[in-house]
Every structure is written in structure tokens, then in C-alpha cells.
């Protein structure tokens, strides 16, 4: 079964269909309580490094390079990515993030890796 991996902003309401919800931001999102976030896990270890996050600064023009650099950082966490892949093969996994841009963010990159076999 192909992994069922989704991405969702932490500011959007949690839904039962989200399955296992994992936040991958290094910093807690502003204005969101832990209760409202309804997370199963806060995986700070899977977030981009502070240096990479600051360099990217959510600039879509930098996204291609950000994507490559973040993928390089994630190579140190293949075991964690494998854990998410296994979990997603048994039910939905929603990678939760705080960025406004729904197409150019760390969750999109991580979801690609989790979906890859």
C-alpha cells in the first residue's frame, strides 16, 4: 500500500481524517495552543536547521535550492523518515507546518521523501 501522506497548515482545523499529525517546525507556531493543534508528535528533529530556515526566509525564488539543502539535512534522519513511511502505509499521516505558502515549504519536501520508496 502506498503511504498516505498529507500536508496541512497548523492554523487549519484538525480533522479525524488527518490521522497521525506531526508538526515539523522547529519553533512553536504563534497563536496556536497545543490543544488546538491536536498533534500526535512534534518532530523538531525533522525541521530545517535554523541557518537554512533563516536563509530561505519563505522566498519562493529560493525554494529549489532550499529543497535540495533540506533534503541533504534529512539524510541524517532516514530512520525517522522510514518510521513515518511505515506509519503512513497503515493510515493517514499529516505533516503539519506553520508557513503561509502551501507549495514552497518544508512539509512539502518531507512529504515527497516519505512517499518515495
Sequence positions of predicted segments:
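Residues lining hydrophobic/aromatic ligand-binding pockets adjacent to catalytic sites
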Residues: 1-117
